[in-house]
Amino acid sequence: MVKRLLSVLVLITIPLSSFSFAVRAYELETEDVVTGGYYLYNFENDLIMAESETDKVIFPASTVKIMTACIALEADIHHDKIITVTAEMLEDYYGVNMRLKAGDKLTYRDLLYALIYGYNDAAYVIALTVCDTPEEFVERMNQKAQELGMTSTTYVNFTGLFEEGMMTTIKDIVTLSKYMAEKEEYMEFVRVFEQ
């Protein structure tokens, strides 16, 4: 569905938030937009319609979970695999959570939905299912960012919670978003929240 939209507007503010929606008008009065930067893109025509401050270094916040989902989906783990939550997986998470407990059993698919919804405990369980340590998962995120040409992005965690040294730009977020929009598997997870 997202690919069928005429255009997508990503607004980045402080604190960082991003939104996507269909744009009904053909003109954008940019002087009326108050943000830390913005990017208006037409998927159908591969056309940048308006942009501002796309190279400015910003804190990525929840957009980090797009890359977390990227690494999770590119891991060689079947979505129907049952994952048993361990105490180790729940040691360090904080923030929004679904109250997972050691011993809980979920499919990898359910964890991916929970990640897209924004649950940090699901992000930790996924990270420690894909990799041996949280640091190894973050290293994969940074490697993928470099592979995609996201030269101004550094990930420090996979939840998006504030940590010193974590940074990105609107341009890099757009690069990742375009890459993920081409992944039908990712779009299936995201579509659930459009309904």
Indicate where each model-derived feature is located.
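Short, Lys/Arg-rich N-terminal segment immediately upstream of the first membrane anchor
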Residues: 1-2, 51
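Sec-dependent N-terminal signal peptides of Gram-positive bacterial secreted proteins and lipoproteins
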Residues: 2-24
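Intrinsic disorder/low-structure terminal segments
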Residues: 15-20, 42, 185-188
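Active-site-adjacent loops and short helices of periplasmic peptidoglycan-processing enzymes
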Residues: 20-171, 180-181
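Extracytoplasmic
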Residues: 172-195
